[in-house]
Amino acid sequence: MSLEERVMELESRMAFQDDTIQALNDVLVKQRRELDHLQLQMAAMLKRQEEMGSQFETFEEDAPPPHY
């Protein structure tokens, strides 16, 4: 294999690696956006659960004992 062929082979491999790296980066960016969105949803659900939990606690305090 001549030097020119070796250089062409290396350039070809580098181009494929660049494409792979870009594809992986695109997936990583998409996953990061999805993770950020899921974290916001989780925070909203936790807040809602806390609000609903305090509503149920007041109902339980006002309820008569089970033997009535």
Curated annotation (Swiss-Prot):
It holds the Pfam family SlyX. InterPro entries: SlyX. This is Protein SlyX homolog. Belongs to the SlyX family. It comes from the Bacteria. HAMAP family: SlyX. Coiled coil: none annotated.
